[in-house]
Amino acid sequence: MSTSTSRTLFPAIAASAALLLSACSTAPSTNAQAAPAASMNAGNAITGEGLENPAPNVTRNWGELPAGRKWGTTAGIDIDPKDGNVWAYERCSAGGAGGGPVDCDNTPVDPVFKFDRNTGKVLANFGKGVMVTPHGIHVDKDGNVWVTDFAANKEGTKGHQVHKFSPTGEKLMSLGIAGKPGNADGQFNQPNDVIVGPDGSIYVADGHDAQGMTTNDAIQAGLERGATSRISKFSPDGKFIKSWGKIGVRHGEFRTPHALAFDAKGRLWVADRGNHRLEIFDQDGNYLESRYQFSRVSGLFIKGDTLYAIDSESAPLNHPNWRDGVRIGPVDEDRVTAFIAPFDREDRVYQGTAGEGVAVDADGNVYAAEGPNSIVQAGGAFTKYSVK
């Protein structure tokens, strides 16, 4: 039963500054499910004050771009597990510094890049004519590159899919129905991210709109029109297995599952961006636990026993007082131990702006994929934060 739109589902979002002024305070609750009190931090997880920056040397506009091209926005970046280099994409010179709406379908350039992690030189570049709006990227243990295509073209013949490429750019598999968003089994409606699990199963985070649904009535309307906020699981050969989750605030529900990661224990982490939390599941979709100290997470990366979470969206109206940036902490605790600060931005004087995707190389250097909120301030699609 829905309630009046005047009653928000997340009163704590508007009041998070008051509720979370100390790093050990209780995180926002979700429909009477209280978040556990976080462990005491050495600094402040909200502002980043008093926290170490492990990668203080900033290289803006990192990575080479072919002659004649301008950087477009991005949201995804990953590390090749075979050689340690960097995979990412840019949206065909559009959506940010390049200007214009994102439309890789009608822009004859290759959006997917492999960069040398030391020099930024292009090692591979492909994907022309396959996607409309790339969103998430993942490199599996065999070096295959997976990319989600977030939106459809005008003709309804491309988009709302997940594509698997070989390391040289051969398209090996596509999931979803080309150009047809929906909530049926095996279908996608704005797929955000993709990851391959330890046994080769494929997991897709699907549904982007729900983060703006802040009332029960808005959520109900979204469900009625077929909007999704779920995780879909497929076999290694692409057969649909199951989905779990819907738009909501309870555990196992999401308001925009924006990014995915696996830890060394084989647990699946979901950045539930609209609910300002991380949700952790086993590989069958059973809820295990949550994290609340890492803010409004857009991108995730787990390296060993360390979690890196990047916040690109916290702003005065959706998450007061929380600064954008990269929060770093131990996988097994809800505790932030380090922080990489955001870029300055005039309309977010206190909170700043940071990228959407994050990855970390073998040396501990951190890479950010700059989205529409940050690409102008960053000066390019990718930023490298070096340890030395």
Kindly label every feature range from the protein language model.
Residues L21-A23:
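C-terminal motif of bacterial Sec signal peptides marking the signal peptidase cleavage site
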Residues A17-A18:
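Residue-level signal for mature regions of secreted extracellular proteins and peptides
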Residues S25-A27:
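Bacterial signal peptide processing site
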